[in-house]
């Protein structure tokens, strides 16, 4: 179902909202502004439960938490808002101190075109011009959301560029499987990660070390444990909690994530073609508006952002995990979120 708001976005036109529903009654909603995943209501014990943090539609252009947004041209941080590519120093717009986060004034702040819409899917597309936020090359990207009959949402990202460039797309949804409307403490959830290595960062979120093995650290989620169990230990102290990338093991073959509600009545499995996963426990969510006009607290939701590693354009040793897109080559990644 396609509808539009009675009020306008910053570009002077109404927001376009698309709602999909499957035979189980699961209902998801998306928006053309930021190609945003607005809502996900999952059947649990004969009721529909909202599992995504969200705010009122007219708050999306101004809030600072990227709720449900499609993020690009480069998700995560690029140190000092610059990198070298093919012998040329590329200078980017900075939007987090001296660094660039999530592509600067990025794809989350644009109106995407509704390219195609069907009973169980919607495809958004966007053109990013050469020099957009400092990035080289014209880029055409698309994001396709599909709601399946087994209560999964699959997100597919595709892109083409006419110059070598940095390209790393993700979705910035925050999950809370217990109470996404008010935002109960997500650290009460249980988390399992199919990941052996994580990437330490400094207090500005910039990598400051090679990849580390998770063994004997608070980043070892290979056996499911409550998120709160080892919270704020070790390398987490620099970032007020988890805000780190993990290298995931063959994530397309088996889930890289299993997130379970505190009571165990709902779980989320994540599979992806991406090499890495940023786990962010909402350490700075305080003050973000809710759908009912109240404010979320810190740790109200967890973002599970499938992507390549942060600051990859400045680290050739990580570029085998993605991050640099060659001119004329096809960019394609997918992630599937399954509720059960």
From Swiss-Prot:
NCBIfam families, sorted: galM_Leloir (TIGR02636), PRK11055.1 (NF008277)
SUPFAM superfamilies on file: Galactose mutarotase-like (SSF74650)
Keywords: Carbohydrate metabolism, Cytoplasm, Isomerase
Name of this chain's protein: Aldose 1-epimerase
GO molecular function, one term: aldose 1-epimerase activity
Active site per the UniProt annotation: 172 (proton donor), 305 (proton acceptor)
EC number: 5.1.3.3
Keyword Nucleotide-binding annotated: no
Positions that bind substrate: 77, 243
Cellular compartments annotated: Cytoplasm
Pathway assigned in UniProt: Carbohydrate metabolism; hexose metabolism
Originating species: Haemophilus influenzae (strain ATCC 51907 / DSM 11121 / KW20 / Rd)
Catalytic reaction list: alpha-D-glucose = beta-D-glucose
InterPro entries, sorted: Ald1_epimerase_CS (IPR018052), Ald_epimerase_bac (IPR013458), Aldose_1-epimerase (IPR015443), Aldose_1/G6P_1-epimerase (IPR008183), Gal_mutarotase_sf_dom (IPR011013), Galactose_mutarotase-like (IPR047215), GH-type_carb-bd (IPR014718)
Entries under Pfam families matching the protein: Aldose_epim
Described purpose of this protein according to its UniProt entry: Mutarotase converts alpha-aldose to the beta-anomer. It is active on D-glucose, L-arabinose, D-xylose, D-galactose, maltose and lactose.
GO CC field: cytoplasm
Encoding gene (name): galM
The family this protein is said to belong to: Belongs to the aldose epimerase family.
Example GO biological process: glucose metabolic process
